[in-house]
Amino acid sequence: MLFAFFPFLFLFLPILVWLWKLTSGEDKARLSVLLLGASLLFGACQGLEALLLLLGLTVVNYLFGLLLADEGHRRRRLGRRGLLLLAVLLNVLVWCRFRHLPALSAWLAQWQDILPVLAPAAMPAVFSFAVLIQLAWLLGVYQRRIRPEGIVRQALFTTCFPYALSGPLVRYEEMGPQLDALEVPQAEDLARGLGLMVLGLAKKV
């Protein structure tokens, strides 16, 4: 499901706006949960396997973030720099495993037929963007610019559907305040947003 597809424009988006208005009088935490649920549904439409892998990687990265944010960890055997390098290595290995190994195996299959059988399926673009977003988040935690704020917030920041599929790559410093200020948009904001969507779709025609 892409932004230009009818299921998104006439089913997913209207239902989300309706549910958003119903939840508007509640705690903002519920709006975060609603947006997370919508983002997970959107991600599942791109590929359930990639979404499950991404959620698992999000949990692992969040645990790395907790360790990096721990003030007492610098005195332990594996310092903060070592933790960061380990986290980056893990993310890069997973990213290469699912983004580049299929193409490499297809190329090598010209000489060896068994390789395509062993190769995993290629992951959608949402996986690549999310991995890069999480790497930037880990770097921000390492540099003490941000702190972990809960696994729900981390999952929402990573999978938020407006930018998870095609970018742009965002930093938590940019998105954190926006996630804190979730609210029901005014009519003029909705009209402006729909106008931008129509303009974007027109450019694709």
Regions found by a protein language model. Give the residues of each.
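Membrane-embedded transmembrane alpha-helical bundles that form the catalytic cores
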Residues: M1-V205
